[in-house]
Design a protein with these regions (language model features):
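Active-site beta->alpha loop and helix N-cap motifs at the rims of alpha/beta catalytic domains
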Residues: 1-37, 49, 53-60
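Short, small-residue-rich loop/turn micro-motifs
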Residues: 4, 73, 183
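Glycine- and acidic
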Residues: 9-13, 17, 75-80, 188-191
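Generic recognition of stable, solvent-exposed alpha-helical segments in well-folded globular domains
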Residues: 18, 25, 90, 114, ...
Length: 215
């Protein structure tokens, strides 16, 4: 990703405008440097570069920033910055409207299931977030029926998988009771096993979304 300035929803509109322009200036410099380095690396694997669109909750700033990034020779776009949950789908739509169809749209920092659906419906292609691993460390387990805390008392003697029907490594080999025990003891294996399940959940979710679109 090209260098950008991540603002917060607490920054003023005036600051957000300055930030959009600053990010655009940095983006142009990044493209120039990327082209120079690509020429130097002739014959080596190509390294893609994405530009990042900022603008907080302001539709006009998001559209302006998207048009600016679209005007540069990026391989794709990153939809970044702080966004209120209620307009996350709208924000994706504002930005994707300005993007060429052949450029991938990556939404940064999204891991809520409903947010993923909102973004996909409005043009988002790929996603990243630390939440599956961060939540796993605290005992939060994602399932098709919602998220639950494995460290609650009812799971202490539950010898079933973290999620019925899940074919991840953790669910095929370990029980809720065992993962609960490891997390309570703060054993690193507990963090790892819970993370494996959560990451598998999101990979499978996106696989199913992709299959639904292709179908």
């Amino acid at each position: 990703f090209a260098f950008d300035e991540l603002t917060t929803l607490m920054n003023t509109r005036s600051y957000q405008e300055d930030s959009v322009e600053r990010t655009f200036r940095w983006a142009r410099r990044c493209v120039d440097e990327h082209q120079r380095l690509t020429a130097e690396r002739l014959g080596k694997p190509y390294q893609a570069l994405y530009g990042v669109v900022q603008g907080a909750n302001y539709e006009d700033l998001r559209r302006r920033a998207a048009s600016q990034i679209a005007s540069l020779d990026f391989d794709g776009v990153g939809i970044g910055g702080a966004i209120e949950k209620r307009i996350i789908g709208d924000t994706c739509a504002w930005i994707c409207d300005a993007m060429p169809e052949n450029r991938p749209r990556h939404v940064l920092g999204i891991a809520s299931v409903d947010d993923i659906f909102a973004c996909v419906e409005n043009g988002g292609d790929t996603f990243d977030c630390v939440a599956p691993a961060r939540c796993a460390r605290n005992g939060a387990i994602y399932t098709r029926s919602g998220r639950y805390n494995i460290k609650r008392a009812q799971h202490k003697f539950d010898f079933g998988p973290l999620e019925e029907g899940c074919d991840c490594y953790t669910c095929r080999h370990y029980s809720r009771a065992y993962v609960d025990h490891l997390l309570r003891a703060r054993e690193f294996n507990g963090f790892t096993l819970a993370t494996i399940h959560n990451e598998h959940f999101f990979v499978k979710l996106l696989d199913d979304i992709r299959a639904s679109i292709d179908g």
